């Protein structure tokens, strides 16, 4: 039978193999080995350099086994803490997302919703009151639109009068203005008896009861002031002028007229002072006209 490999005569002896194994162990542990043959020393130095090149950093910088175990345990503990912190952060973020979504649902709750009680408890009372008023006003406005569509103009007018007073209680300006615009539009439809009527440009922003002056565009009649009663001075002027015109005047006598618009002018000679004449019939108990005073001609 043919044998493969080296023949038995070519195999090294066991003691040489043992010596080589001991040499490799000594080089691995960086132990100093002395050889009698210089060639063996050179070979040992070459193998030691090769060992140092393969081990980087060098073996002198390697840590001990205890230090390696301590570093491994510290790394594992740090990874566990990091995982716990990430889990805590994730749970907090999930809770915030849930709360924010729930808060948004509560904030958007309206009267009649399941969460409206919680909405009323969390938010201010004015907003809750506005929600109730707006909901009631919109329901009444929808009823008014139905009355207009059916031609019930009188009922729609009465309902609009009630809604107009209710809208003013809304504290939110934007929501109140929206309701006012709807009320004005329905007022226009009721006044014109036209379900398809629209708001006229320049219509008032505040709602008024249908048919009232504030909600109509008909021009108002001009205001006529009552005549003022004549003053005593003006009543005395006709009697004085009548007395002067009826009295015979000579040709040489110049007619003198006192102008009421210039009271500061001095009377000419022969004129009559109005203050000396009686003012009206109330000062004459007999009810007769005042006696005429003769005017002497001027020379």
Swiss-Prot record:
Keyword Membrane: yes
Annotated phenotype, changing residue 50 to A: 10-fold reduction in binding to SigD
Disordered as annotated region, ranges: 187-299
Extracellular side: 107-299
Record's signal peptide: none
Domain of life assignment: Bacteria
Gene3D superfamilies per the UniProt record, alphabetical: 6.10.250.1300
Transport is among the record's keywords: no
Ranges in the topological domain labelled Cytoplasmic: 1-85
Post-translational modification, as annotated: The cytosolic fragment (residues 1-94) in both free and SigD-associated form, is degraded by a ClpP1-ClpP2-ClpX complex, as would be expected after S1P and S2P intramembrane proteolysis. This releases SigD so that it may bind to the RNA polymerase catalytic core.
Function as written in the Swiss-Prot or TrEMBL entry: An anti-sigma factor for extracytoplasmic function (ECF) sigma factor SigD. ECF sigma factors are held in an inactive form by an anti-sigma factor until released by regulated intramembrane proteolysis (RIP). RIP occurs when an extracytoplasmic signal triggers a concerted proteolytic cascade to transmit information and elicit cellular responses.
Protein name: Anti-sigma-D factor RsdA
